[in-house]
Amino acid sequence: MQGYLEQIKPSVGDAWRTDELYVKVGGNMKYLYALMYDETRFWIAQQVADTKYTANINPLFKEGKELTGKRPNTLISDGARNFNEGFKKEFFTVSNPRTRHIKHIRLQVDHNNNKMERFNGEVRDREKVMRGLKTVYTPILKGYQIYHNYMRSHEALNNKTPAEACGIKVEGENKWVSLIQNASAKNLGF
């Protein structure tokens, strides 16, 4: 199903957020890096790494560019060194328009990371119920990304899913079944 969904380009805007959160994998602490479109909360890409500040997150940003077909005009992060290095490698350009990296988050102004922190709490709540993940290669995180984007409606989006807010409509009473059927039909060439 993931391959099917990767062929659908979400209509995302120019402001993206990124952050990391720790997750327990096989009894060890790992870090889940996530990239999200600010306005609709569409979870664009993810990456699991062993370390927090030194992990190479270029693949996360590269996947985001490939999925959306663009780079953001603004990237909001907590300013960790690896976010800045990934930004320079994947998003920075000398030609205009240049992508701006907002890396100093403040609580009282527009440049906070509250949406991303709320998202982190959502993922952490799910992981806590599961008592951690068994392996880095688990399909649970990709499945949760699908659930977050295509199934879970958000009150702040007028009870739409992030995918619906990005122009992707999943028809049917049971969206899981619809996505599975669509992915199967695509793979069979119907």
Give the ranges of each region predicted by the language model.
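A short acidic (Asp/Glu
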Residues: 28, 83-89
